[in-house]
UniProtKB/Swiss-Prot annotation:
A motif (Involved in interaction with stylet and aphid transmission) lies at residues 360-363. This is P3N-PIPO polyprotein. The record marks 308-309, 767-768 as: Cleavage. The lineage of its organism: Viruses, Riboviria, Orthornavirae, Pisuviricota, Stelpaviricetes. Potyviral RNA is expressed as two polyproteins which undergo post-translational proteolytic processing. Genome polyprotein is processed by NIa-pro, P1 and HC-pro proteinases resulting in the production of at least ten individual proteins. P3N-PIPO is cleaved by P1 and HC-pro proteinases resulting in the production of three individual proteins. The P1 proteinase and the HC-pro cleave only their respective C-termini autocatalytically. Its EC number is 3.4.21.-, 3.4.22.45. Keywords: Host cell junction, Host-virus interaction, Hydrolase, Inhibition of host innate immune response by virus, Protease, Serine protease, Suppressor of RNA silencing, Transport, Viral immunoevasion, Viral movement protein. The keyword Protease applies. Residues 165-308 form the Peptidase S30 domain. It comes from Plum pox potyvirus (strain D).
Length: 1024
């Protein structure tokens, strides 16, 4: 294919002009007869024309879309005119709509005239004649008479100022006089150059300086603080020369408050960053270097510079401006200046610190901290500060009576608070948590609003008035008590929705089989099983556990149904229980608060009002069954050794409620929970407590452990005949026909503890048991046994540290405890865990030291009795999760009361018989200490003999025969030192003693003797 280029256009010839065809055409062209214009030229012209048309069409199509898009702009630009802006920029200026309309109307008129002319009838001109006689005459445009102007001529006369022309000397003299006048009258001076510079004369340290206004005085931190041209600089230097410009400044004389001062840089002793050597305009200091205001600094340096501005003056100016704007405009007298200005400033500062205490008035953190404080925090923190400022103003500024009156009122307003918390508590207790209906809701709201005291807002006052109005309306409308509803209309159906126990649904507390994992709770639950449950001996059968006796009757368990038969008929008989006496729904089944039923504290009924009677409850093995009125949930009991089965002791069935609460207890609180139940609640509940006492105990636990409020209860059966509640455990119930209590959670059971609840069931008994009383003598014996047994002592220190206080019953026990180092070890253990226990053990150590100084037993007991009151006050501190705590408190209180009584008797001249009895107690306890010490000495002797035997066996073989006798003497002396007993020589011993002690003197048969000592050591350890 051939290509021909026309200018910038490239033409590709088609196949007709191939190279072969071109050669053939060229040969033909060389012939003379074919020298005319060939077809090749025509083809080239056609191809070129085609390319040009293609280019033009492509160009037109390329610009067509843009032209259509910009057509509105072109149409608008048609009526725009070009203008020239600054720097020769020419642009279009849009015309107004009025101008465009006028232009379009003119174009329309012209087009219309042209159209009428073109389309009008033809006019034929036959001839054109010219009158040559008449010459063309110029006719002037007719004169238009101008109307007279009636405008008033301006009377303003243009003033033309004559230019002031001065010589250099006259100008200098003029500026000096201006400077002298400004200096004398304190006027500002403005120097107008490229930029305006304002200055004035000011006094600092009895010296007059010329001061310019720099930009950082306005609060900004620019890079250039002041810009001066050369002419302004000369004038500024002339004004500075009229002040103490040439004063020599020592190091440190340029201080804050001198921003903008014009000084001589030659007379400055401080290191400085100068702009030139003619002037130095103070800006501030950066890294101990003075900075000139004209010097350019970076943005970082401008923030780091310590500017020498005068904040006090700015504060004074701001205070003055605001005071003048806010002062009273209308007064009944003429205001005069009677008080001292400085004292006014002092009092203003006192008032400022009283209202808004702060470290610095410019500190943003102080302002934010104060703004975030509540009214209670402000009152608690600053009430004493306000009182101090009031006292200062009263002592130093008594003439400011109005300020004293303001501070007094402000302090009284700050202290307006309702401190009658006792009445608030009583009202809340009398109303209770469940009374949400009127008028109790209004009373509760008024009680909550009044307790706020001075913190009540205007909205609170409005709400209190509204509630009081409702109470007045209620009291007005109530003319008689609401008639109580009939028992026949009482309905208390089971809820259709099952209670959701989130503790049993949490994946983190379930194992792979979906069973509840007790974790650390399993270990601490043993306190319940060890004290309140019996282990079922399967070999004896289940029959002995079927009948459960109570103070008012019996109930049969379904534990015998654990033995099941393969005979279906016999198995169906196990589904039949033993029917109890049938009771209809009566007042005994209901609980009321006021005139309303408290349904969770009532028995469950059917839809027709008949009571829901319990059916046979099948037993399970090692399960805790929770869920009272809903579907029961089976939780595996903590695992026991050998898969033993536990059953609550007679009267202990209510412990299952506390065991169910343990499910909701956090693992780290399980120890304190179980100890609180064991040591605090169960001793108070005693045997067969009432439901009211049990509910109160549950409320006590719910306060300490709020997560137990939604713990599910085991099924509780109501026996109205025996007036007793039965808490059903995993062994079910064979007795049927009892009523069922509706309460399903601990929070619902707590309602029985309210005094406002009218219910006969509050006095019903619940299963319980009596814990063995703490025996002081047994505990003292345990303490004596642990003195010389480190393992037992360690267990005592960790689990029952208050048992150490029982040593005050005997001086011998106290000193033995001190000499063994147990008190010191207890102090070291508890010093980082409980400061109270560490202080108690330290007091016992100090008491033991004082007791050791007394010579007689009565004197030792007197020392202990004198310190019993101090120990009692230190020990008694609320409730502690230790069994020995209450025992120690009671012991110390008894000793304290006995000592006070004995002092009274001694003062009256009576003798006390007790002085003859301490030796009897000491005689009873001292053998235990001696026996323990003898066992320790015996073990020590055995270990000593074993050590000496090992030494003798090892080293006598290596000695020379002549030196063995000397070695025997050395070993004999070592034994006498260790065992504190003199050892006889072998020559003076009997044959039996020689055989017994032969190990000490001869290495013969040492292995046999060692074996005999090992056997004796085992015997001693067993019997000690």
């Amino acid at each position: 294919m051939s290509t021909i280029v026309f200018g910038s256009f490239t033409c590709h010839l088609d196949a007709a002009i191939h190279q072969d065809n071109a050669d053939r055409l060229a040969k033909a062209w060389t012939r003379p007869e074919n020298r005319q214009v060939s077809n090749v030229h025509l083809l080239c012209r056609r191809a070129a024309k085609s390319l040009i048309n293609t280019y033009e069409s492509a160009t037109a199509s390329a610009w067509k879309g843009l032209e259509e898009k910009l057509q509105p702009m072109f149409a608008k630009r048609e009526f725009s005119k070009t203008v020239t802006k600054r720097k020769g920029l020419r642009c279009f200026k849009e015309s107004s709509e009025k101008f465009i309309e006028k232009k379009l109307r003119k174009q329309y008129q012209e087009e219309r005239e042209r159209f009428q002319f073109v389309n009008g009838p033809d006019a034929i001109v036959n001839q054109i004649s010219v009158d040559k006689c008449e010459a063309s005459v110029w006719v002037p445009f007719p004169h238009i008479i101008e109307k007279p102007s009636f405008a008033t001529p301006s009377m303003k006369k243009k003033v033309v100022f004559t230019k002031v022309r001065m010589s250099e000397a006259s100008l200098q003299l003029f500026m000096r006089r201006v400077a002298a006048n400004a200096k004398a009258n304190g006027q500002k001076v403005e120097i107008i150059g490229r930029k305006r510079v304002v200055g004035n004369y000011t006094t600092k340290s009895r010296l007059t300086y010329f001061r310019t206004h720099v930009r950082h005085l306005d609060g900004s931190k620019p890079r250039y603080d002041l810009v001066l041209d050369e002419a302004t600089k000369k004038i500024l230097q002339l004004f500075a020369n009229t002040s103490r410009f040439h004063h020599v400044h020592k190091k440190g004389e340029v201080t804050p408050g001198m921003s903008g001062f014009v000084v001589n840089p030659i007379n400055l002793s401080d290191p400085m960053q100068v702009y030139d050597t003619d002037l130095f305009i103070v800006r501030g200091k950066h890294n101990s270097i003075l900075v000139d205001s004209r010097c350019k600094v970076s943005k970082k340096q401008s923030n780091e510079i310590i500017h020498y501005s005068d904040p006090g003056k700015q504060f004074s100016d701001g205070f003055t401006n605001s005071f003048m704007q806010c002062k009273l405009r209308e007064t009944d007298h003429q205001s005069t200046s009677d008080l001292d200005v400085k004292e006014c400033g002092d009092v203003a500062a006192l008032v400022c610190q009283a209202i808004i205490p702060c470290g610095k008035i410019t500190c943003l953190q102080c302002a934010q901290k104060y703004s975030y404080m509540s009214q209670q925090e402000i009152r608690d923190r600053f009430s004493t500060v306000i009182e101090q400022h009031e006292k200062t103003a009263m002592d130093n500024y008594p003439q400011f009576s109005h300020v004293l009156a303001f501070l007094k009122r402000y302090r009284e307003l700050m202290r307006v608070e309702n401190q009658n918390y006792e009445a608030f508590k009583d009202i809340t207790h009398m109303i209770g948590e469940d009374r949400k209906e009127a008028p109790f809701s209004h009373l509760q709201q008024i009680n909550e609003l009044i307790i706020k005291g001075g913190m009540m807002s205007a909205q609170d006052y409005i709400e209190a008035s509204d509630h009081l109005r409702e109470l007045a309306r209620y009291q007005k409308n109530r003319t008689e008590n609401i008639r109580s509803g009939s028992i026949k209309a009482f309905r208390n159906k089971i809820s259709s929705k099952a209670h959701v126990n989130m503790q049993l649904m949490c994946d983190n507390q379930l194992d792979t089989n979906g069973n509840f994992v007790w974790g650390q709770r399993e270990y601490h639950a043993k306190r319940f099983f060890r004290n309140y449950f019996d282990v079922i001996d399967v070999s004896e059968g289940y029959r002995r556990h079927i009948v459960r006796e109570n103070p008012r009757g019996i109930r049969k368990l379904a534990i015998g149904n654990l033995v099941i038969s393969t005979n279906l008929a016999a198995l169906r008989k196990q589904l039949l229980g033993e029917e109890c006496i049938h009771f209809e729904v009566s007042k005994e089944c209901t609980s009321r608060r006021g005139e309303n039923f408290v349904y969770q504290c009532c028995c469950v009924t059917h839809e027709d009002g008949t009571p829901l009677e319990s059916e046979i409850i099948s037993p399970t093995k090692n399960h805790l069954v929770v869920g009272n009125t809903g579907d029961s949930k089976y939780v595996d009991l903590p695992t026991a050794k050998g898969g033993a089965m536990f059953i609550a002791k007679a009267g202990y069935c209510y412990i299952n409620i506390f065991l169910a609460m343990l499910i909701n207890i956090n693992e780290d609180e399980a120890k304190s929970f179980t100890k609180t139940v064991r040591d605090t609640l169960v001793p108070k509940l005693g045997t067969w407590p009432s439901m009211m006492d049990l509910a109160t105990a549950c409320h006590f636990l719910a306060v300490l452990y709020p997560e137990t409020r939604n713990a599910e209860l085991p099924r509780i059966l109501v026996d109205h005949e025996a007036k007793i509640f039965h808490v059903v455990d995993s062994f079910g119930s064979l007795s049927t026909g009892m009523h069922v209590l509706k309460a399903n959670t601990i929070n619902q059971l707590i309602s029985f503890a309210s005094d406002t609840l009218d219910s006969n069931m509050k006095t019903y008994l619940v299963g319980g048991s009596e814990v063995d009383k703490c025996d002081e003598f047994k505990n003292v014996k345990l303490l004596i046994r642990s003195i010389y047994k480190p393992q037992i002592m360690e267990q005592v220190l960790k689990e029952e540290p208050y048992l150490l206080l029982m040593s005050v019953l005997s001086p011998g026990v106290l000193m033995a405890l001190f000499n063994s180092g147990s008190l010191e070890k207890a102090t070291q253990y508890w010093i980082t865990r409980s400061h109270t226990l560490a202080a108690i053990t330290s007091m016992l150590s100090a008491l033991a030291a004082k007791v050791s100084l007394a010579s007689t037993l009565n004197a030792q007991m007197s020392v202990i009795d004198e310190h019993a009151a101090v120990l009692c006050d230190s020990v008694f501190d609320g409730t502690k999760p230790y069994a020995s705590y209450m025992m120690a408190v009671k012991t110390l209180e008894r000793m304290k009361a006995r000592t006070e009584s004995d002092h009274t008797l001694n003062d009256l001249g009576f003798s006390v018989l007790r002085q003859a009895t301490p030796h009897l107690v000491e005689k009873k306890l001292s053998p235990g200490i001696g026996a323990s010490l003898e066992r320790v000495k015996l073990v020590g002797k055995i270990l000593c003999n074993l050590g000496i035997a090992a030494v003798a066996k090892t080293y006598t073989k290596t000695f020379h025969p002549k030196r063995r006798r000397r070695f025997r003497r050395q070993v004999r002396h070592l034994r006498s030192v260790i065992t504190w007993q003199p050892v006889q020589t072998p020559e003076r011993r009997s044959p039996t003693e020689k055989r017994r002690c032969g190990l000490l003197y001869t290495p013969v048969d040492g292995e046999a003797i060692l074996q005999s000592h090992r056997n004796f050591h085992k015997f001693s350890s067993k019997h000690s």
